[in-house]
Regions:
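Negatively charged, low-complexity tracts enriched in Asp/Glu with abundant Ser/Thr
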Residues: 2-65
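A structural detector for beta-sheet-dominated domains
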Residues: 15, 29, 76-78, 85-87, ...
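Short, low-complexity, polar/charged sequence segments that are solvent-exposed and flexible
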Residues: 44-48, 103-106, 117-118
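Secondary-structure boundary elements
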Residues: 1, 113-119
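Short, highly charged C-terminal tails/helix-capping segments
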Residues: 120-131
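A generic alpha-helix propensity feature with a strong bias for hydrophobic helices
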Residues: 34, 103, 129-131
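Weak global preference for isoleucine
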Residues: 14, 26, 51, 75-77, ...
Length: 131
């Protein structure tokens, strides 16, 4: 029997801007995933339906591979693994990172659930998850 890999330890919190608007933030405890944090904060925040659709198409086998290009970051979605990287070739922005595609898909769905919780006014933040 294959041992199930734990998902990344992460924390969701709410960032409040001066104009009283809020944004969901996700942080991963492993610094390797800093670029992934940026991907959620900029791209998933703005383009959730498109990203979810492309990941789902690969995870369910409708497509062998796919990709998405956002405002700052891109993802190359493979059957087993997805690369998250900055569009600009500038190492000061952050290094690319790789994550199992199915895990990224689950994290994107979870992020949407957390965003819905935030908008409902749920008093659960900050919340740390590791499953």
């Amino acid at each position: 029997m294959r041992k199930r890999r734990k998902m990344l330890k992460r924390e969701y919190d709410i960032f409040k801007y001066q104009n009283n608007s809020t944004s969901l933030m996700i942080s991963f405890f492993d610094p390797y995933y800093q670029t992934l944090c940026e991907f959620f904060d900029t791209e998933v925040h703005n383009f959730y339906p498109h990203i979810q659709k492309e990941l789902e198409a690969v995870v369910t086998g409708q497509k062998e591979e796919s990709g998405f290009g956002g405002n700052m970051l891109n993802i190359d979605i493979g059957k087993e693994e997805t690369e998250v990287y900055y569009q600009m070739d500038d190492e000061s922005l952050g290094d690319p990172c790789f994550i199992p595609t199915e895990e990224l898909y689950k994290l994107v769905l979870e992020w949407k659930e957390m965003e819905d919780e935030m908008h409902s006014g749920a008093d659960i933040f900050p919340v740390t998850l590791e499953d």
